[in-house]
């Protein structure tokens, strides 16, 4: 009995230490955010920037590879500046398509700075939740072929799923994070995750975290296992999501994107590095919204859905001293929520094919133009526009337009502008704190792309007007 009490006290002490450590870090970040929105912002930002460059040194981009089309030179300047100012600590690449034409393709830095391994055209990297957009494409292909409908109940293709209040959950609810299956009660091992039958039993028996259809909450990890179930049970050949994508997309169109990387290719993968405390403070000072990302898991109650997601599975860890996403065992796993491995040029080409109607019909693509769900997300507790497996960003040039795609942890992002036919893919192994437009490097690159596009469009309009006037004269 005494031993059990001692064990309980030790566990409680560990929890207190964990909470205390998180609180101290958040206090530092909180002070940084207060300074960021105060009149002292410019002085603080300049001081932090100088300190970061002094301590960690500037990154001299001496291995830039790629090109930009005429009129898009500003994108290259921003790409170089991201390194020179220390925002890119390791390596990065960006590829942009305008319809079926590459207008930007840049890469450089380090695949592994600690070992001196440079980023090359063959370097691949983990793109985290950007992988979810690829899962959404696979489901869209099966919908377009008539094998399933978004309105179908999941129990139509998976009768065992109709347990514990899940009988009315549709494929649409699952893809738009409305099913209430964001966190699992049963601890998941790596062996479980690689066992389709086991994960089938776990998800089928899981009781929803909230009444399905009433809320939307980000299914950060479970999305991958759920999409795998949808694909396996609707594909006439019964293939896993990784095999379906490889055979129907990657092999057919020559796309180097892996949902389950062959171990023989592990040497091509960049090493991911976490931001230091100094970099975290720097991000907050320049954009206090980053603090929200930190607060999602650090300030939520222990029994919150966000904490449950972070705790299970235990082998998914992104911390200062532990980053399991560098583990080759995980790289080989078919997990379409977080473990896609690719290059920016292949990621961009994949979604340019989507825009061209090469993977599923443009009629179906039109349904993805705007989010199905907006408002506060039940898990991350911030607005998270989403739908059909994609996340959305407001177009940086204003108006009511959306960019559709998916950001990933640390900055990796793919986004499509369906109106102008622009596809942007950005990947990086020096992880940042935010996602999507909260990632400074990506946001500045994205904005520069659309600024250049607007100038191109304005120039074309002037030329057309001058030509019309010349004909009239």
Swiss-Prot record:
Annotated GO CC locations: membrane
Key words, A-Z: Membrane, Transmembrane, Transmembrane helix
Pfam families in UniProt: Beta-lactamase (PF00144)
Gene3D superfamilies, per database record: DD-peptidase/beta-lactamase superfamily
Chain segments annotated as transmembrane: 26-48, 125-143
Domain of life: Eukaryota
Main location (coarse class): membrane
Subcellular location: Membrane
Topology of this chain in the membrane: Multi-pass membrane protein
Disulfide bridges in this chain: none
Keyword Transmembrane helix attributed: yes
Matches recorded under InterPro entries: Beta-lactam-related (IPR001466), Beta-lactam/transpept-like (IPR012338), Beta-lactamase/esterase (IPR052907)
PANTHER family: BETA-LACTAMASE DOMAIN-CONTAINING PROTEIN 2 (PTHR43319:SF4), BETA-LACTAMASE-RELATED (PTHR43319)
Protein name: Beta-lactamase domain-containing protein 2
């Amino acid at each position: 009995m005494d031993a059990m009490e001692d064990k309980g006290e030790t566990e409680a002490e560990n929890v207190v230490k964990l909470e205390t450590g998180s609180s101290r870090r958040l206090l530092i970040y909180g002070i940084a955010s207060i300074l960021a929105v105060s009149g002292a912002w410019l002085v603080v930002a300049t001081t932090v920037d100088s300190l970061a460059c002094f301590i960690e040194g500037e990154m001299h981009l001496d291995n830039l590879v790629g090109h930009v089309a005429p009129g898009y030179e500003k994108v290259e300047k921003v790409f170089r500046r991201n390194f020179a100012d220390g925002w890119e600590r390791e390596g990065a690449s960006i590829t942009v398509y305008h319809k079926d034409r590459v207008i930007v393709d840049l890469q450089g830095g380090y695949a592994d700075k600690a070992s001196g391994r440079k980023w090359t055209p063959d370097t691949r990297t983990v793109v985290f939740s950007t992988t979810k957009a690829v899962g959404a494409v696979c489901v869209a292909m099966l919908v377009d072929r008539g094998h399933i409908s978004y309105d179908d109940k999941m129990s139509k293709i998976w009768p065992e799923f109709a347990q514990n209040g899940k009988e009315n959950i549709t494929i649409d609810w699952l893809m738009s994070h409305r099913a209430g299956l964001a966190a699992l009660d049963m601890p998941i091992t790596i062996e479980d995750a690689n066992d389709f039958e086991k994960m089938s039993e776990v998800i089928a028996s899981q009781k929803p975290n909230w009444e399905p259809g009433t809320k939307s909450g980000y299914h950060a990890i479970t999305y991958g296992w759920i999409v795998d179930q949808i694909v396996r049970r609707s594909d006439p050949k019964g293939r896993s999501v990784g095999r379906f994508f490889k055979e129907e997309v990657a092999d057919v169109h020559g796309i180097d994107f892996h949902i389950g990387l062959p171990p023989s290719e592990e040497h091509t993968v960049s090493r991911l590095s976490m931001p230091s405390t100094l970099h975290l403070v720097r991000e907050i000072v320049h954009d206090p919204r980053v603090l929200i990302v930190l607060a999602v898991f650090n300030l939520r109650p222990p029994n919150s859905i966000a904490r449950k997601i972070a705790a299970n599975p235990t082998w998914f860890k992104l911390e200062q001293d532990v980053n399991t996403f560098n583990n080759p065992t995980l790289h080989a796993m078919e997990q379409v929520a977080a473990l896609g491995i690719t290059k920016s040029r292949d990621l961009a080409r994949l979604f340019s094919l989507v825009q061209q109607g090469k993977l599923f019909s443009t009629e179906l693509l039109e349904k993805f133009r705007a989010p199905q769900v907006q408002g506060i997300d039940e898990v991350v507790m911030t607005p998270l526009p989403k739908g059909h497996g994609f996340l959305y960003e407001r177009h940086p040039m204003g108006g009511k337009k959306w960019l559709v795609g998916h950001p990933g942890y640390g900055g990796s992002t793919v986004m499509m502008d369906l109106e102008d036919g622009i596809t942007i893919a950005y990947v990086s192994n020096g992880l940042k704190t935010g996602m999507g437009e909260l990632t400074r490097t990506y946001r500045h690159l994205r904005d520069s792309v659309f600024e250049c596009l607007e100038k191109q469009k304005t120039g074309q309009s002037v030329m057309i007007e001058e030509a019309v006037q010349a004909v009239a004269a």
